[in-house]
Amino acid sequence: MSETTTRQIHDAPLRLIAARIRKARREADLTLDGLGEIVGTSRHHLIRLEKARHRPRLEMLTKIAEATGRSVEWFLDPDVDPSPFQEEAA
């Protein structure tokens, strides 16, 4: 996928993004408070993201991806492999 745009975030199914944020956080063994501290947001905001009550901005999704070892595309595209972590390029 080419550079992720704000449009791609708006086009992606909100429930997919929410479920993958929760999955990534849990598989990275992070609490809501822990992830919030890393990405600079509140526990309450993360709960809203994980319950599909709010669509994340590109900047926030990028921070969550970095904190959990995922690619931004993994959160947006149902066809991207849902394996726990992206493999490092050799």
Identify what each model region corresponds to.
Residues 21, 35-36, 46-49, 75:
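Conserved hydrophobic/aromatic packing and binding residues within compact polymer-binding modules
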Residues 19, 43-44, 58-61:
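Short alpha-helical elements of helix-turn-helix
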Residues 2-6, 76-90:
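Short, charged recognition helix plus adjacent turn
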